[in-house]
Amino acid sequence: MEFSAETLRQQLGKYKFRDLTIEELKDLNRTFPSFIFSMETYTFRDGSQKDLLNLTGTVPMKHQGTTYNIPICLWILDSHPFAPPLCFLKPSGNMGIRVGRHIDAQGRIYLPYLQNWSHPKSTVTGLIREMAVKFEEELPLYSLSAEDGARQRELLSYIAQVTDGVSSMDVKAPSRAKVTVIGGGDMALACLLAVSAKGTAGKLLLLDPTDGEAAGGAAADLEIFSLPNVQVTKDFSAIAGSAIVIVTVNSWSNSQSYVGVLQSNVELLRGILPAVAHHCPKCLLLVASQPVEIMTYATWKLSGFPHNRVLGIGCNLDSGRFRHVIEKLADSEEGAQGAWIIGEQSDNKVAVWGAPDSSANRQTPCKLYPKIFQEQLTSRALEILKGKGQRSWSVGLSVADITDTLVQNKGKVHSVSALCKGQFGVQEEVFLSIPCVLGSAGVTGAVQTLQDEAQIWETLQRSAAAIESVQQQLRL
């Protein structure tokens, strides 16, 4: 390509050593004229972004008498030439990455030349020459067979998400949103740690609304033993910009009646949700407080949000466990995709067989077992799962699973607490767990179950009536 020093000078306006960088790139252009320069957005591991100079091109080399052109991508940091570039392979869909001494599974390139980088001895031109030498010793890429092509395209998408950075020119950078967890107890900490481990959030915030230290043990511990990208606060203004707000607050007292405890929870929400709605008017609310159906309903009413942006964790954990057991019993992952636990998160929940995960990225249809076999599998699976509780850590993993789908806009199906009026013959304004398609807009659709037995409908309708009866006793 034609080299334009003036264009580069304008693009590198924020670079500390712009003139030195331009002179070095002139030399690179003379030696490797096929490299293309462009300013692209680089996403770091912590979710922060910076506009950096991106170089894409090929490294010519020979291996066993055959000439190869290895596609690479270099990111030139704004402290160049005193800091080495970040280097990645850039394989096409029919290429596989060969992990070796200098290449990791994500295509990141590691060379002694980079480790020993020292200006003015080290240059980008010298780096590419070093790559050619090392690539001749060990080819970094290999040709895929046709049947591996589809898997490789998925790999490339994955690589783009887990490497230090990715050019938006090739693959859209994964969303790494700000996520807030509200609460100060074990449930809040479990959700926070699970979401952090999932890697979905660029920034995590724990907002502890409790007064004093008694109820805020988890928050206090996090202030002592801090975690990267995690902020602990009592200031509601700090949650501004959160894409997801996870509600875990609960108030339990042995001296109160059941309705009294629920009313205490409602009052907690009343003191929290107006501030959430003010600072995060576009966020999604994910409720993990118990009982989740009633607390999700109260959150919906008190927040004033559209019902599609308010959901509860529902039976997502139960459904995941149920499908896992079905897979083991039937020795088939494919056959468990249509198995769901729905309804009320209590002894009244029911197992159903419905449509498979209808997300856009699933191409394999669900295997439909004969009804008698479905019943046998269901009975055996529920027997195995009997007595399996919902401890904080397991609920936290379920919350992280849902959060990942919402933030990444996966269009994946989860059994979550959603407004159920008009489905399964339910006429009440209640939230029950049903298979829903989730994305960045919240609940974007519901999956129609294949079973319409009267017994299932009656169970859901009884749950809806009982829940509404309690809701009518609450002051909202």
UniProtKB/Swiss-Prot annotation:
Domain UEV: 2-145
PROSITE patterns according to UniProt: UEV
An annotated GO BP: carboxylic acid metabolic process
Self-association and partners: Homodimer.
Keywords, comma-separated and alphabetical: NAD, Ubl conjugation pathway
One Pfam family recorded for the sequence: Ldh_1_N
The protein's name: Ubiquitin-conjugating enzyme E2 variant 3
UniProt-annotated binding residues for NAD(+): 185-213
Taxonomic path: Eukaryota, Metazoa, Chordata, Craniata, Vertebrata
